[in-house]
Amino acid sequence: MATFKDACYHYKKLNKLNSLVLKLGANDEWRPAPVTKYKGWCLDCCQYTNLTYCRGCALYHVCQWCSQYNRCFLDEEPHLLRMRTFKDVVTKEDIEGLLTMYETLFPINEKLVNKFINSVKQRKCRNEYLLEWYNHLLMPITLQALTINLEDNVYYIFGYYDCMEHENQTPFQFINLLEKYDKLLLDDRNFHRMSHLPVILQQEYALRYFSKSRFLSKGKKRLSRSDFSDSLMEDRHSPTSLMQVVRNCISIHINDCEWNKACTLIVDARNYISIMNSSYTEHYSVSQRCKLFTKYKFGIVSRLVKPNYIFSSHESCALNVHNCKWCQINNHYKVWEDFRLRKIYNNVMDFIRALVKSNGNVGHCSSQESVYKYIPDLFLICKTEKWNEAVEMLFNYLEPVDINGTEYVLLDYEVNWEVRGLVMQNMDGKVPRILNMNDTKKILSAMIFDWFDTRYMRETPMTTSTTNQLRTLNKRNELIDEYDLELSDVE
């Protein structure tokens, strides 16, 4: 029983403004929609159901019915979902604007209640006040919201969400923003609304209000790769495959500084209708480049590593070894379709082998060495502590020699031309014969930073940017990378 959805259905019949604002895909004729994947709350109609991906941000936050309108909480167009979305910092004045919007769209007074009661009492069997017939009158005004942290912004999507105890498979978490407002003032608003209802309905209204206004906020979730759909890109493993984003916009671009003021637009109904009549869509092609996707890719690579290669004498690079059960890697995995990962894997393994061979370790492919367990971690550059520990364990395994208080290892084994170029690039134009710990870290990190410079990388994909940010980046031609030309981050 989706209270918010029912309220939108009944209240949109009140006037022209409501018919425009409260139009939901969930209340309209169903159209073919993408397959649903996760359980959670649709941000558009607030019902708990199976969710599909949003074409505006690639997150799973819309049901298959509401997906037909392609609404995203990051849109510029001030539709109902966008007007219910606030950014930190939320002030008391912002909340007043939200509550005023609720009162405007979902009023409760004696005249309106009688109108709804008369429309329900069509037959004698409907003389009772059954909750399912009056569900739309039982939506209290609360500061219940779903929250998500994207880059440096925290978003709050206010609404009335039923079934809070159900399983949540999305990155959005429930938060109670009552502490940002006056508890007694909110109580007074709801008691006034409730006073116009029949006694039986008052009891249910009060129960719903207190359960949705006095709950404890839950801890924020960390985003993961699985929270984003692959459906917006042709090939998730190709660096040249872009994510296709659709955003709803209006002719009068609203500054992000005024983000929380969107809900105040409906105060002037004529102006709001005029703004909505100027709505249009903007399409963007954006890069996949972000830390979240990078961590995921390197996580797969680290699980596929064949560390025995660093003791081998194979003439071919690490990914091209055949007929060796200790060194041959399964290169049929989709992750190897990314040429950047192939280059990084081959170069890192070649450099480590050169260090091992240079420092007197006369092993073989079949050797079982203690250092093997640290080799996969050398690709987890986003996990700084783990990566540093792996480099240090490798360096110590090479039995460095102390020279004037600094430990050094040799580098006199042949490396391929690409590795040689990277070493020279990071070591003042020459290939040194000895390396200390910092030199080793510098070279190993440079091999990864050449293609995935995580030091200057967004945490989440650009699909989570606001429409204004996308527009600005597009003007600077910074939405896509030059990987189709095989130009690295450094180049």
Swiss-Prot record:
Residues 42-79 are annotated as: Zinc-binding domain. Residues 320-491 are annotated as: Interaction with host IRF3. A motif (pLxIS motif) lies at residues 485-488. Plays a role in the inhibition of host innate immunity by inducing the degradation of key host factors required to activate interferon production such as IRF3, IRF5 or IRF7. Associates with components of cullin RING ligases (CRLs) including CUL1 or CUL3, which are essential multisubunit ubiquitination complexes, to modulate their activities. GO terms for biological process: symbiont-mediated suppression of host cytoplasmic pattern recognition receptor signaling pathway via inhibition of IRF3 activity; symbiont-mediated suppression of host cytoplasmic pattern recognition receptor signaling pathway via inhibition of IRF7 activity. GO terms for molecular function: metal ion binding; RNA binding. One of its GO terms (cellular component) is host cytoskeleton. It comes from Rotavirus A (strain RVA/Cow/United States/WC3/1981/G6P7[5]) (RV-A). The lineage of its organism: Viruses, Riboviria, Orthornavirae, Duplornaviricota, Resentoviricetes. It holds the Pfam family Rota_NS53. Residues 82-176 are annotated as: Important for cytoskeleton localization. Residues 1-81 are annotated as: RNA-binding. The keyword RNA-binding applies. The integrity of the zinc-binding domain in NSP1 is important for degradation of host IRF3. Belongs to the rotavirus NSP1 family. It comes from the Viruses. Interacts (via C-terminus) with host IRF3; this interaction leads to IRF3 degradation. Interacts with host IRF7; this interaction leads to IRF7 degradation. Interacts with host CUL1 and CUL3. It is found in: Host cytoplasm, Host cytoskeleton. This is Non-structural protein 1. InterPro entries: Rotavirus_NSP1. Keywords: Host cytoplasm, Host cytoskeleton, Host-virus interaction, Inhibition of host innate immune response by virus, Inhibition of host IRF3 by virus, Inhibition of host IRF7 by virus, Inhibition of host RLR pathway by virus, Interferon antiviral system evasion, Metal-binding, RNA-binding, Viral immunoevasion.
